Amino acid sequence: MKLEDDKIHSPTNTEEEGYGSDVEVENGTDISGSKGGSGVELKRPDLKGSFRCSICSKVFCHSSSLSRHRMQAHFKSYKCTVCRKDISSSESLRTHMFKQHHISRMYMCRCCNWAFPDKSLLHIHLQTATNNNDSNNNNNSVIPHGVINRSCHLITDPFQLIRTPLLNLPTPQSLESSVPSLPIASIPIPALQSPIRSQPQTPSWLANLPKPIPTTAPIFVADSKEKIKDEVEKPDVYTSQSPTCSSVSFKSDLSAFHQLCSDRALISSPLIDTASPSSSSSSSRISPRHECFDCHVSRTKILISENKCKLLEHKIGTMQQESLEANAQMNGLEQTVLRLRMEAHALREHNELFQRKLLECQNLAVKFLQNDKAHDASEMNSFLRILINNTILTRPF
């Protein structure tokens, strides 16, 4: 049964979409260098078998071929399990998970195309779906992942399948007294606090885990042990027992994975206090991988705006310098225009004076010719003197 479960939850069927796969070692084989299903088929020939499509009953030799067939023929969208939104492509899903939920890695279920923010949640999801079909597939020679009962994905609250195994985990008597006395690798996972508990059977793989299930949620440092105890004792979740699965009601409208991530933050905070006491004084940080994408975009826009402002200031300074030079040139031109106007006025006066003198000379010449004194030398000399005096425009100094 263990070997069959390994085939059901092989890396080919739990390949993460959008981001590179982590280095995983299952059954002693490294599959970190594989891309899609072809590399795994070459390195793991034991995964070859009969994979039947539960919708059209076609049989495929490899699980990757079955997954590709499901996505191309039957399922045209991916589902975000955080906000329960249907998305058309894996690239759009990756962008949505990073921008809307600040999740940099996602893990896909090849059966229903749901995107999980944590690999442990994907394993719980697949294990729960597989346990519901073990009784129906014991005598079937076909590998059962292709015929998983898809009714588990028709539940109104799909996260009941994830929380059901967690409700039966042991709770320590006192979080304050038990955490410092135990080594890091042996700290148990605290169960969700509820007044009524159901009694489902805990899966063997979950009970034998050597350490808490890892999570991609940011780890926050607790301020004090009393604060941790108050947060653990706070009754945030109420459960009630039903014949099929436990129904969970939340106080707020937050998603189910948000509640699980907040519970794991309480588990992670004592580990930091035990390993390094000095880290409690530092402020809570978020990994650079989980930086806000909107912050990067806003910072880039601010830098572009600052560069534009500097360029505009430089242009304004240049235009002010040019305006000062233009004002100086205008002042010089105004002085030149005034000087030219004065010269024109002086030339106009000289022209008028010359015209008057010319008219006087003409009158004197006409009078001299009318008197018939041209033969008298003395009269001629006096006439010439008068004519010369009239032609002088300015008086000598």
Swiss-Prot record:
Single Gene Ontology MF annotation: DNA-binding transcription factor activity, RNA polymerase II-specific
DNA-binding found in the keyword field: yes
Principal localisation: nucleus
Region (Disordered): 1-40
Zinc finger regions, C2H2-type: 51-74, 78-102, 107-125
Subcellular location: Nucleus
UniProt keyword list: DNA-binding, Metal-binding, Nucleus, Repeat, Zinc, Zinc-finger
GO biological-process terms attached to the record: positive regulation of transcription by RNA polymerase II
Pfam families according to UniProt: zf-C2H2 (PF00096)
Listed Acidic residues bias regions: 14-27
Any one annotated GO CC term: nucleus
Classification via SMART domains: ZnF_C2H2
Annotated protein name in UniProt: Zinc finger transcription factor family protein 30
The species this protein was found in: Caenorhabditis elegans
